[in-house]
Amino acid sequence: MRRHLIALTAAVTLAVAAVSSACTGDEAAVSRDGANATVVRVVDGDTVQVDIDGQREKLRLIGIDTPETVKPDTPVQCYGPEASAFTKQLLPEGTAVRIERDVEARDDYGRLLGYVYRADDGLFVNLEIVAQGYAALLTFPPNVAHVDEFVAAARAAERANLGLWSACSG
C-alpha cells in the first residue's frame, strides 16, 4: 500500500510539473531566436496585440515609453493619442512582424517583451517611434540590447523638437 501511495504521489507531482511548465509559456512564445507574428491590434503607442502561431499575446515594445492613453486610473497624457495613431500607422492590423527578445521574456504584467521589425521592409518599429518623437527612452536592465540606438534617436528627436518634445514641453 505504501509503495502504491508513493508511486501515485510521484505521478501526480510529475503531472503537475508538466502542466505548470506548459502553462507558463515564457520561453515558448518568443524564443531567444525570435518569432514571426501578425499584428492583431495596437493597444496604445508602446503595446500591441499579436498572434504567434495561433496564440494571442500582448507585446510591450522594449526600450520606449509613449504617453498613456488606456492605463486605468490615469488621464490621457499629452501626445498619447498621436503616439497611438502613429503606432497604428506603422503596424496596421494584419501586418507581419518579426519579434526579437532581449534577456527577459515578460514584464511584471505578463506581457511579452520584444523588439519589433516589420517583415516587409525590416523597419525597426521601436526605434522609429522614438526617432519620430512619439516616445521617450525607457530602459529596464537587463533588457538593453539596443539602448545606444534608442539614446541617439531620443536625443535627435528632442533636439529637433519632434512630436512630444515640441507639443508637451511647456
Question: What is each stretch, according to the model?
Answer:
Residues R2-G170:
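Small beta-barrel nucleic-acid-binding modules, primarily SNase/OB-fold domains
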